[in-house]
C-alpha cells in the first residue's frame, strides 16, 4: 500500500539545499559584520537583494531560505554574549575565540546558535553542515576543529542526540 502522506524526495532535498545556502550566506554575513562592522539591517538588505540566489563576480549563489538566513544571523547577533563563552569553553585551552580567524568565529557562532535554538534540525546535521561551510573557507585541520567544537556544544544542548560525555 502506498503512503500518500509521503513527500516527494525532491522537496526535502530542495529545502536542504536552500538551508545549506542560507547557512553559507549567514556565515558570510556574520563575517562581514565582524570585519566591517556592518549593521544587521544593512546586511539583510545587501544579502537578500544582491547575494541570495544571484550571480556575484561570476559565482552563482544558490537560492537560500531567507527566513532561515535571517533567523541564524539575527539569533547570533542577539545571543552572541551567551554563545561566545560556550564556544570558548569548547575550544582548546590557550585558544580563546578572539584568537580564532573571523570566518571560523562566524561558523562556530552560527553552528552554536543553531544547536541551541533550532531543534527542528537534527544536531548531527547542524554539525555536518557547518563543517561543510567551513570547508569552503579553511583547510582540513580547521574543519576538524569546527567539528570537535560543535560536537561538544551539541552534547551540551542535545545530549539525547549526541550522547553525553
Curated annotation (Swiss-Prot):
UniProt cross-references to PANTHER family, sorted A to Z: ANTITERMINATION NUSB DOMAIN-CONTAINING PROTEIN (PTHR11078:SF3), N UTILIZATION SUBSTANCE PROTEIN B-RELATED (PTHR11078)
Organism annotation: Bradyrhizobium diazoefficiens (strain JCM 10833 / BCRC 13528 / IAM 13628 / NBRC 14792 / USDA 110)
Record GO biological process: DNA-templated transcription termination; transcription antitermination
Gene Ontology terms, MF aspect: RNA binding
Listed transmembrane segments: none
Gene Ontology CC: one annotated term: cytosol
Family named by the database record: Belongs to the NusB family.
Record keywords: RNA-binding, Transcription, Transcription antitermination, Transcription regulation
SUPFAM superfamilies: NusB-like
InterPro entries, A to Z: NusB-like_sf (IPR035926), NusB_fam (IPR011605), NusB_RsmB_TIM44 (IPR006027)
Protein's job: Involved in transcription antitermination. Required for transcription of ribosomal RNA (rRNA) genes. Binds specifically to the boxA antiterminator sequence of the ribosomal RNA (rrn) operons.
Name assigned to this protein: Transcription antitermination protein NusB
Domain of life: Bacteria
A Pfam family assignment: NusB
